[in-house]
Amino acid sequence: MTPTRSPRRRTSTVMFAVLLLFIAPILARAALYAMSDDPRSWRDADWSSTGLLPAAADSTPARVIIFTGTAGAWKGIFSVHSWIVLKHANEPRWQRYDVVGWGQPIRLNNWPVDGKWYGNEPIMLADISGPEAEKLIPRIEATVKDYNYSQTGDYRIWPGPNSNSFIAAILRTVPELGLALPPNAVGRDFRYGFYAGRTDSGTGFEINLHGLAGLKLGWVEGVEVNLLGLVAGLDWRHPGLKLPGFGRIGVDLPVTTALAR
């Protein structure tokens, strides 16, 4: 007769898995932050341009660019901040959209389009140009205009809607990008109530309860488990491990430069 595990043993196994996958990485990130000289206040942070993008007048094609940067102060232990930059062909100025937690959530051109975020170098996730970008821009602009959480007081740092919830909402309207925000973009999984359906990239399936708990399985997302907005999982497309706080550890991700479909 095969012995069965006792309920106490099973509970201990689950608790150990939660500790190993969710709590330990956050404690490690907190320790690294405590030992760092990262700015603790926005007043001390560098918000200057990094020079990643040319002047809009020197870039003729339409472009859609998505950036992330480690969030400021203690929030950087848990999350990155995401924003989107776009321009129509021959337009003389970039348009940068962010969502923030004070005043009106949606902000236009409050910072340099390729600026550091709280002193942290931005990471470019996608850079679509030419006719493909021109095709996406009207839907992106419509999503910005119709965003459900655009009024003062709508912002919630956790579990959302926050800056990452905003960019995730945009990605859902342009699934041909085949893009997902990093696993440490806390708030990206926020959806009001219960959701079961396609992932943000359109390449998989997810179940989600208000961004607080969920499971994803997809080509772009890999395998992800969401617990209280923290994500652990595996990336099989570009092999890597996903851990709360650290995001993704593994093979470097290429910048998305063409539509997936």
Per-range role (PLM):
Residues 111-176:
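Mid-length scaffold segments of soluble, non-membrane domains
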Residues 94, 108, 144, 178, ...:
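Ubiquitin-like/PB1-type beta-grasp interaction modules and other compact soluble beta-rich domains
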